[in-house]
Amino acid sequence: VVINGSVSSGGGASPQVIGGATVSIYQAQTVAPILVTQVTTDSNGNFTAKVPVSTGNTTSNPATYYAVATKSPSIQLMASLGSGPLTAVKINELTTVASAYAYAQFFQSNYTIAGTAIPLSIAAGMAENLASAQSGTASTVIQTSPNGYETNTWSALGTLSNVLAACTQGVSNACTNLFAVTPSATGVTPTTTLQAIVNIALNPAANVSGIYNLGSVVTSYTPALTANQGPN
């Protein structure tokens, strides 16, 4: 399977492309994931990756793939690729948030993903129900009734994506501020944006106001939570 993808930061019509990012594509396992291939984005943030599909990829034993894009020691974004895997993907903060929540219970202490086939495939479906990895936008499920503007889910995804985007886009002190309010349950400070959002997903009651306030620095993902929807 040939995957044509891109890595960028921010939502809307003009996201910031991320050139020179290392894109690692993994096949999740019951233990450590298999690194299937690794490529680098060009100056426009685009990449092409060839993924040999597992011969054991069946309906009863689906193989689950995911991509992690790393630009610097602090910037790490993710997208779920399902069991196909997808042939087109746009990796950004929104796909990272969706993946963190969908796979939350499968992240190991080193932030790799591990689990058995069927539960992992269900998590992949959950990720796609939150954000379309092909378009890099909120899924149709999230954008339409009974979700849409009738619940806070779409806006919450936007706010959390904006929280990560400030760090990704190099806003002064944004990464430091993000990592300070997103420790793991055991108190370990994260060092990447992916680790930070996974910690948020696993510890939803921790530092809620501090995390929410970071979402106002960069506001390129819309809709986002308004003041009366926030915790303050």
Feature roles, as predicted:
Residues V1-N232:
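Feature for extracytoplasmic/surface-facing segments of secreted or surface-associated proteins
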